[in-house]
């Protein structure tokens, strides 16, 4: 069995989905292999991204020789996805409809000067919301809202689901949760990790006593479009474009529900959210006149600095991450041999930002450094065991969640407008890879964030795909004024009260890194009490400078 070079799951930059692939033979030149059946791949991409340079063509030829199966997979899948079938409900079906144009037309006077009450280009966005009857689904007894952000100009519709805090919603902070992928629904985070309930194999609701909404209100957002309950006739294929949508959603949501706009607001997420969150936070902070009280960001097992992080796949797979080796000495040496070329390709992507540099880097590096581990059948999200359910990204619960969310009564209760719900949309995953988004150096945004807000990077130590070694390494390699102080900071134990140690933390200035024991890619699922503990302590300002 051969594997694709990209397919993330649950938000991981993984190569987890098997595709039927064949190595091209015959008399074709290497570059001729990169064609979509019935159309020229090159002409399609040059129309969108500009003409390929001679240097770029040489790189593509090289990658085709080094990773022919991976390029063949690319060829087969470089086809624009079809729109997600959906049927928009009348505005009369919703309890609230907020027009972005109306919000944008609001002006206030400050120091004798008039300016917009809420900055940003909101005129093409609208927000729809409905109050969810807690008794209808039994997820939680708290106040809930669901709905869509509509980009009317581009036919994009982002689904969200809000749960009020179980504790003190008038004063508790608000958290936006984002799963990764790119292309995985944040409702998987709701039901598998940190939401108020989970779904069992009989599709029954099971209460989560360690839900993150114990002491915070939480918004779960399906983004980018065509993920989960979100849909569009067009698509988003890069993180920056997705950031504009998220800013509009939050601006209109807090306008409609001002009772939550004064509370502290935090963005949290995992995996490819390591790309999303720096960009989304930067977009929010770029608007001086805003109704979003952003106080911090949290990234769990994220992909943020690929140049640094990809250097730690071999150590993690070969017994240097705290768990037994998965690969033999020969395979480990082959990964060591592949790393310099991988890092040179990523560095070219970092410097040029061009799709012609970034896509070959993704194809080669994923094939060389993730592929060997994946072919063992070991779970890329948890090095401690095998992938038990490959049809559901190793976790049967993902299938239960999809089945539950596809029930007509559930979709009706939430106002969902799509014909079907999918936990992960691999077309989106490929779109982001094909647009060169995978290795964009968004970690370079983090120093600017640290000037204004605290940043927490946490990592379960059993994850392979976005492992703790790589996450620790990029936090220490990050160039910012507090780098020396952070790297010399004392590493302290993490424990619930006087209980058993569940991890280690290092913090200096506005920057904090946590290693969490016995947790894979999805920390709140594997260590629910520990994740609840560090979340509440973080929101309470324990590690803030």
From Swiss-Prot:
Name the Gene Ontology biological process terms. Answer: proteolysis
Record's keyword terms, sorted: Carboxypeptidase, Disulfide bond, Glycoprotein, Hydrolase, Protease, Signal, Vacuole, Zymogen
Catalytic activity of the protein? Release of a C-terminal amino acid with broad specificity
PROSITE patterns hit by this protein: CARBOXYPEPT_SER_SER (PS00131)
Pfam families per the record?
Answer: Carbpep_Y_N (PF05388), Peptidase_S10 (PF00450)
Report whether Glycoprotein shows up as a keyword of the record.
yes
- Known InterPro entries for this protein? AB_hydrolase_fold, Peptidase_S10, Propeptide_carboxypepY, Ser_caboxypep_ser_AS
Q: Where does this polypeptide localize?
A: Vacuole
Please report the name of this protein according to its UniProt entry: Carboxypeptidase Y homolog A
- Which lineage do the record's taxonomy fields give for this organism? Eukaryota, Fungi, Dikarya, Ascomycota, Pezizomycotina
From the UniProt record, report the name of the gene that encodes this protein.
Answer: CPYA
């Amino acid at each position: 069995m051969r594997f694709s070079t990209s397919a993330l799951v649950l938000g991981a930059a993984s190569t987890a989905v098997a595709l039927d692939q064949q190595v091209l033979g015959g008399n074709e030149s290497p570059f001729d292999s990169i064609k979509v059946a019935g159309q020229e791949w090159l002409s399609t991409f040059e129309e969108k991204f500009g003409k390929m340079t001679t240097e770029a063509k040489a790189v593509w030829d090289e990658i085709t020789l080094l990773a022919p199966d991976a390029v063949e997979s690319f060829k087969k899948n470089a086809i624009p996805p079809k729109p997600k079938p959906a049927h928009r409900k009348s505005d009369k079906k919703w309890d609230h409809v907020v027009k972005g144009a109306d919000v944008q037309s609001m002006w206030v006077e400050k120091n004798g000067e008039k300016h917009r009450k809420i900055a940003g280009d909101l005129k093409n966005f609208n927000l729809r919301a409905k109050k969810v009857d807690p008794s209808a689904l039994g997820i939680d007894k708290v106040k809930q809202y669901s709905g869509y952000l509509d980009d009317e100009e581009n036919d994009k519709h982002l689904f969200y689901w809000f749960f009020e805090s179980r504790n003190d919603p008038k004063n508790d902070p608000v958290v936006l949760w984002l799963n990764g992928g790119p292309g995985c629904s944040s409702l998987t985070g709701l039901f598998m990790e940190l939401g108020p309930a989970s779904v069992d194999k009989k599709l029954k609701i099971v209460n989560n006593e360690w839900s993150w909404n114990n002491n915070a209100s939480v918004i779960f957002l399906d983004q980018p479009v065509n993920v989960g309950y979100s849909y569009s006739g067009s698509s988003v294929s890069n993180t920056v474009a997705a950031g504009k949508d998220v800013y509009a959603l939050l601006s209109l949501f807090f306008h409609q529900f001002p009772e939550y706009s004064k509370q502290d607001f935090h963005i949290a997420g995992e995996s490819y959210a390591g790309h999303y969150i720096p960009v989304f936070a930067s977009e929010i902070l770029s608007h001086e006149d805003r109704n979003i009280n952003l106080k911090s960001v949290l990234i769990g097992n994220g992909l943020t600095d690929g140049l640094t992080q990809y250097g730690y796949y071999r150590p993690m797979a070969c017994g240097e991450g705290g768990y037994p080796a998965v690969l033999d000495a020969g395979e480990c040496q082959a990964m060591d041999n592949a790393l310099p070329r991988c890092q040179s390709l990523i560095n070219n992507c970092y410097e040029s930002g061009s799709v012609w540099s970034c896509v070959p880097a993704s194809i080669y590096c994923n094939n060389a450094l993730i592929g060997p581990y994946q072919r063992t059948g070991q779970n890329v999200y948890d090095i401690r065991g095998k992938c038990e359910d490959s049809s559901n990204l190793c976790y049967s619960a993902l299938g239960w969640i999809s089945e539950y969310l596809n029930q007509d009564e559930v979709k009706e209760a939430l106002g969902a407008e799509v014909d079907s719900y999918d936990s992960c949309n691999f077309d989106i995953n490929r779109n982001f890879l094909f647009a060169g988004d995978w290795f964009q150096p968004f970690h370079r945004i983090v120093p600017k964030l640290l000037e204004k807000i605290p940043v927490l990077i946490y990592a379960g130590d059993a994850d392979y795909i976005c492992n703790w070694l790589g996450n620790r390494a990029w936090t220490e390699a990050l160039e910012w004024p507090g780098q020396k102080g952070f790297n010399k900071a004392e590493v302290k134990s993490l424990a619930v009260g006087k209980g058993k140690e569940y991890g280690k933390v290092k913090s200096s200035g506005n920057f904090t890194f946590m290693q969490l024991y016995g947790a894979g890619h999805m920390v709140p699922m594997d260590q629910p009490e520990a994740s609840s503990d560090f979340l509440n302590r973080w929101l309470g300002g324990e590690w803030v400078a």
